[in-house]
């Protein structure tokens, strides 16, 4: 179930403040954030936000299509190392 429309989308207040300051100044800097739950709002379009994935900050360039999604959706927290190679399991004998 989604968030109440009465409350509006969640955006970290500090992140929104930084975005508004950059928009007023007309600058495009990379902004580091740990707030993966923040919703992407139209004010963020055109900015690059470095979203923390638990290991490092992943730079995410915000486009029009991303509005309404959360920042954490674009910074994956799990790495897929790949499946085991078939040749490695062929030589083993089951007991």
Curated annotation (Swiss-Prot):
User: Quick one: a GO cellular component term?
Assistant: small ribosomal subunit
Query: According to the lineage, what is the superkingdom?
Result: Bacteria
Q: Provide this UniProt record's keywords sorted from A to Z.
A: Ribonucleoprotein, Ribosomal protein, RNA-binding, rRNA-binding
Transmembrane portions of the chain: none
The UniProt entry, under Gene3D superfamilies, shows: 30s Ribosomal Protein S19, Chain A
One GO biological process this protein is involved in is: ribosomal small subunit assembly
Alphabetized GO MF terms:
rRNA binding; structural constituent of ribosome
- Give any Pfam family that matches: Ribosomal_S19
Role played: Protein S19 forms a complex with S13 that binds strongly to the 16S ribosomal RNA.
State the family it belongs to: Belongs to the universal ribosomal protein uS19 family.
Q: What is this protein called?
A: Small ribosomal subunit protein uS19
Q: Which gene encodes it?
A: rpsS
């Amino acid at each position: 179930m989604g968030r109440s429309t009465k409350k509006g989308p969640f955006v970290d207040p500090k992140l929104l403040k930084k975005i508004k300051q950059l928009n007023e100044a007309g600058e495009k800097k990379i902004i580091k954030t740990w707030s993966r739950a923040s919703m992407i709002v139209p004010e963020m379009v055109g900015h690059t936000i470095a979203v923390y994935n638990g290991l490092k900050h992943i730079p995410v360039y915000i486009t029009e299509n991303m509005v309404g999604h959360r920042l954490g959706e674009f910074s994956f927290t799990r790495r897929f190392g790949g499946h085991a190679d078939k040749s490695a399991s062929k030589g083993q004998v089951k007991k």
